[in-house]
């Protein structure tokens, strides 16, 4: 039976209504500081926590409830004779319910230029301690940490048999979930402030919170949720959806891939993408030129895909985009008239992107664990020419473009390009010659000046195939024990080849 409750909340919007319910049920209310004042202002009878502890709040409120008269009242097991005798001997009254919410550490931490001395005061100590104590003793104590549960709990208090052990366990699980999340936020924030921070800590406790529930996952029979990183606001959590249906699991994954690809470039760029694989990447002097060049790489695969830009979409481009069926269009800005044109397609998802990609690490789930690695952000501006045939400044720029593009193609990956536009892409093949054949064959009607490979050539067969299609220069990491064979083949056909010394495998 619930006889005494302790209420201590930072957010006080719903505490009054809940306290009124408790009072109507004859439940004694204990409360702290500002919460007690709020309740008293609303004519609710409250016992200040100092009257229970016989000790004042000290250190400007740092110590309020860290006291045996509070912790003992929460942790005592009602069916344990020794526990209850201890309470009786020490004149400690049991506490049967607590409602606690915590200092808003995250909200303050996410403010710009927050002072560490100020932030430290928003690390709650007493609140998590009470929550953990009550959750540990869930069979005897109701622990409430989520204001969305208050209405249901208020109803159940009127029929106590509904506060069964399973429901209490649910509340306890939720409570420990909150305190673990809260501590994770603090740990990760403090680690990020270190001069020599630990990039890979002993325990992985990255704080993610539920953003929204999706209709389904990758397939209709799979359930899915989107969780966002609490301490950062990345591109996929800060965009504005200006039109269209809700985003699906696949939409978000593909949009993330397209946005990362198009932001690889400083110049005006466009990326057309389907099923997380680029089907066209291009630069242009204008947005429309970049789009037309990217589209022409593979006008078949783009049907039902995504088009991303790193510049404002104008009317001319909007009119072209409207001609085909697309799932998503992404850009940092839209001309007002261009947006009106695109909105004529009611189901077209139009995203206004408010952030460039910011993630430092990426996570891959494997059965029983998670792989964590740094995001592949390394760029090159120079390379080693390993053939007698040298490269002009124009070809050098083309090679650097193709190298950036191939980084975003699933391995084994080959990109053929001309005029800073992909003309053929070979993706996800189990061997490199198949990827090369795919890319070269797709480029043959459009032509290609250079070929980029995400990893080294184990044999000279890719060079032989490239020569058949008139490739002038090749960029690859180098590092194969048979590099000499590929270099000799290039010399045979007058093809320039450069080594970057860096690989760009992409398996997800």
From Swiss-Prot:
Pfam families: AICARFT_IMPCHas, MGS. One of its GO terms (molecular function) is phosphoribosylaminoimidazolecarboxamide formyltransferase activity. Keywords: Hydrolase, Multifunctional enzyme, Purine biosynthesis, Transferase. It catalyses: (6R)-10-formyltetrahydrofolate + 5-amino-1-(5-phospho-beta-D-ribosyl)imidazole-4-carboxamide = 5-formamido-1-(5-phospho-D-ribosyl)imidazole-4-carboxamide + (6S)-5,6,7,8-tetrahydrofolate; IMP + H2O = 5-formamido-1-(5-phospho-D-ribosyl)imidazole-4-carboxamide. It comes from the Bacteria. InterPro entries: AICAR_Tfase_dup_dom_sf, Cytidine_deaminase-like, MGS-like_dom, MGS-like_dom_sf, PurH-like. Gene3D superfamilies: 3.40.140.20, Methylglyoxal synthase-like domain. The keyword Hydrolase applies. One of its GO terms (biological process) is 'de novo' IMP biosynthetic process. The IMP cyclohydrolase activity resides in the N-terminal region. This is Bifunctional purine biosynthesis protein PurH. It comes from Petrotoga mobilis (strain DSM 10674 / SJ95). The gene is purH.
């Amino acid at each position: 039976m619930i006889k005494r409750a302790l209420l201590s909340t930072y957010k006080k919007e719903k505490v009054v209504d809940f306290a009124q319910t408790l009072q109507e049920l004859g439940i004694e209310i204990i409360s702290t500081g500002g919460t007690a004042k709020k309740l008293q202002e609303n004519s609710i009878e409250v016992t200040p926590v100092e009257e229970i502890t016989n000790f004042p709040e000290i250190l400007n409120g740092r110590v309020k409830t860290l006291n045996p008269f509070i912790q003992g009242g929460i942790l005592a097991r009602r069916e344990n004779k020794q526990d209850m005798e201890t309470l009786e001997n020490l004149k400690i009254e049991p506490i049967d319910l607590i409602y606690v919410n915590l200092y808003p550490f995250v909200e303050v931490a996410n403010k710009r230029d927050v002072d560490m001395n100020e932030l430290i005061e928003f690390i709650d100590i007493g609140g998590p301690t009470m929550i953990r104590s009550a959750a540990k003793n869930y069979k005897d104590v109701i622990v409430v940490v989520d204001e969305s549960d208050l209405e249901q709990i208020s109803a159940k208090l009127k029929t106590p048999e509904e506060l069964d052990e399973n429901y209490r366990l649910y509340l306890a699980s939720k409570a420990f979930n909150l305190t673990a999340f809260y501590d994770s936020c603090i740990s990760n924030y403090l680690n990020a402030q270190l001069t020599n921070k630990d990039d890979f800590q002993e325990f992985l406790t990255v704080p993610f919170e539920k953003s929204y529930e999706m209709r389904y996952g990758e397939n209709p029979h799979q359930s899915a949720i989107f969780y966002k990183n609490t301490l950062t606001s990345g591109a996929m959590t800060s965009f504005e959806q200006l039109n269209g249906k809700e985003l699906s699991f696949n939409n978000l994954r593909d949009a993330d891939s397209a946005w990362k690809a198009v932001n690889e470039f400083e110049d005006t760029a466009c990326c057309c993408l389907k099923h997380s694989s680029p089907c066209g990447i291009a630069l242009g002097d204008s947005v429309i030129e970049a789009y037309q060049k990217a589209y022409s790489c593979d006008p078949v695969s783009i049907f039902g895909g995504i088009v991303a830009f790193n510049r404002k979409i104008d009317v001319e481009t909007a009119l072209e985009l409207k001609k085909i069926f697309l799932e998503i269009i992404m850009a940092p800005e839209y001309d007002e008239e261009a947006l009106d044109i695109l909105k004529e397609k009611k189901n077209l998802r139009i995203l206004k992107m408010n952030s460039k990609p910011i993630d430092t690490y990426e996570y891959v789930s494997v059965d029983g664990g998670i792989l964590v690695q740094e995001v592949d952000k390394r760029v090159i501006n120079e390379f080693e020419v390993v053939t007698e045939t040298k490269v002009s400044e124009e070809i050098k720029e083309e090679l650097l473009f193709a190298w950036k593009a191939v980084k975003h193609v699933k391995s084994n990956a080959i990109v053929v390009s001309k005029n800073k536009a992909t003309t053929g892409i070979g993706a996800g093949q189990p061997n490199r010659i198949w990827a090369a054949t795919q890319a070269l064959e797709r480029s043959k009607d459009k032509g290609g000046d250079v070929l980029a490979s995400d990893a080294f050539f184990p044999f000279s067969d890719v060079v032989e195939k490239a020569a058949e299609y008139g490739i002038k220069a090749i960029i690859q990491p180098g590092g194969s024990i048979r590099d000499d064979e590929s270099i000799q083949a290039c010399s045979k056909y007058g093809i320039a080849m450069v080594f970057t010394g860096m690989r760009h495998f992409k398996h997800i």
